[in-house]
Amino acid sequence: MADIIIKTHRLRVESLFEPYRSTIGKDYDGYRNHVYRTITYAMHFLGQSQEYEALVETAFVYHDIGLWTDRALAYLEPSEAVALEDNARYGWGLDPEALRGAIHWHHKLFRYRGLHQEVIEACRKADWIDATQGWIRKGLSRSSIAKVESVFPNLGFHQSLMRLAKDYGGSTLVGGIKVTRGIVKW
């Protein structure tokens, strides 16, 4: 597999984040770096195809955003709704089914098969790499993951998820169960 390419600034990502930065609040820096890491992994799996770049960038900015916009532990559908609404409102021209699918299936345990399979599967694999902090590698080398993580450090992102599970669910255990039931797909 080719060396991983890391883009440290993505204009589209920064502009998409801008209206939501205050909503995300203190979790912004950690979430932003999570988004950059997952975009980096997904674009690697897609061979840096420009055909998918705008979709991947948009999907990852929005993929967890329902945690903050809707304060929801079952955040996939709220995240999809915000992404689809903004896609229509701002006329980005992204395929709504591909955008929805990349968000909806990013926690799927097993390989995604279906419409828009290539991009959805790349996004799914990318998020699993980052969600597990590299324990699941999906074919990437440890050194590639370490390289990406050194450029975009965690900055407490995974701890933020645990805090939100507790805040929204009443306890870390109950919140963790609600999150798992609400977002994991088979």
Q: What does each model-identified segment do?
A:
Residues 1-11, 21-49, 91, 108-186:
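Divalent metal-dependent phosphate-bond-processing catalytic cores, especially two-metal-ion Mg2+/Mn2+ enzymes
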Residues 37, 60, 98-101, 121:
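Amphipathic alpha-helical interaction segments
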Residues 38-42, 74-89:
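An active-site-proximal "capping" alpha-helix that borders the catalytic cofactor pocket
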Residues 47-54, 69-76, 89, 93:
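Alpha-helix boundary/capping segments in eukaryotic regulatory proteins
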Residues 53-70, 79, 100-107:
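His-Asp-centered metal-binding catalytic motifs of divalent-metal-dependent phosphohydrolases/nucleases
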Residues 94-102, 112:
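Active-site-proximal substrate-binding core of FAD-dependent oxidoreductases
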